[in-house]
């Protein structure tokens, strides 16, 4: 597919004209979703579609026909060259659907994590969008401690996830993650990893752990942008990170899941 040069910016969508440069700012985000787009290829695109359209429907974001039409037009408008980190949005008030085009930031292969668990400040933890600004503040505080990410914890200190990432770890040969009854975002990348583990016969367990109990374990923070990032350093407290003996092979597998956008 040949496209003209595409610049960063916000495109507001209407059924009549499709995505077009937005005239003003949107209201508070009700729903958002984002993914890595590299040379027109993405992983788990159907899962992002399902999560975003389902969340929009729950928020009264329009009929299924309207939401599907937006997704189709949005997909056609995505760049087919370069590295991008697009975000789709549903705004409160007008229920406007938007596409935010932005270049992908530098990708990381490892992550430093603030070892002091942060109380989970989210108001809608199972839906991406409403709490993005609040979580950006948490990450900002982590950066002040020399870290890339922070771990959100519940009142009892049990870990939930990172500010912008899902949390997984290994206990011997068992892949572990927080129990689904906890208020965590259903991560697309986490779902892909769990599917591979099941196909490979790897045991998966949902366990409650504090940050302290992650010391000496191989811990991963995963999301749609960076993929799998093993924790190589805990900052702010004398915690040791385990060697990331599994991460490289799983990162290679995850990169190979990148597929062309539908219709290309």
Stretch-by-stretch model annotation:
Residues 84:
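Non-catalytic DNA-binding core/recognition domains of DNA-processing enzymes
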Residues 1-76, 80, 91-264:
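Helix-start/capping segments and mature chain N-termini
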């Amino acid at each position: 597919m040949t496209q003209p040069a595409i610049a960063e910016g916000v495109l507001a969508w209407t059924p009549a004209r499709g995505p077009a440069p937005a005239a003003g700012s949107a209201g508070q985000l009700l729903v958002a979703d984002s993914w890595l787009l590299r040379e027109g290829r993405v992983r788990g695109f159907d899962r992002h579609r399902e999560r975003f359209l389902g969340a929009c429907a729950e928020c009264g974001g329009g009929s299924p026909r309207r939401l599907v039409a937006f997704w189709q037009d949005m997909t056609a408008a995505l760049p087919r060259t370069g590295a991008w980190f697009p975000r789709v949005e549903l705004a409160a008030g007008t229920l406007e659907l938007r596409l935010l085009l932005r270049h992908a930031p530098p990708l990381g292969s490892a992550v430093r994590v603030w070892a002091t668990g942060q109380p989970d400040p989210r108001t809608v933890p199972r839906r991406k969008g409403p709490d993005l600004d609040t979580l950006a503040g948490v990450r900002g505080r982590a950066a002040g401690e020399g870290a890339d990410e922070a771990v959100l914890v519940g009142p009892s200190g049990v870990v939930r996830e990172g500010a912008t990432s899902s949390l997984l770890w290994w206990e011997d040969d068992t892949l572990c993650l927080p129990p689904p009854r906890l208020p965590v975002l259903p991560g697309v990348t986490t779902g892909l990893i769990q599917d591979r583990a099941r196909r490979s016969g790897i045991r998966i367990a949902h366990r409650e752990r504090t940050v302290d109990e992650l010391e000496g374990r191989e811990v991963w923070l995963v999301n749609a942008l960076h993929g799998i990032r093993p924790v190589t350093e805990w900052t702010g407290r004398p915690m040791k990170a385990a060697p990331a003996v599994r991460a490289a092979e799983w990162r290679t597998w995850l990169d190979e899941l990148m597929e062309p956008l539908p219709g290309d």
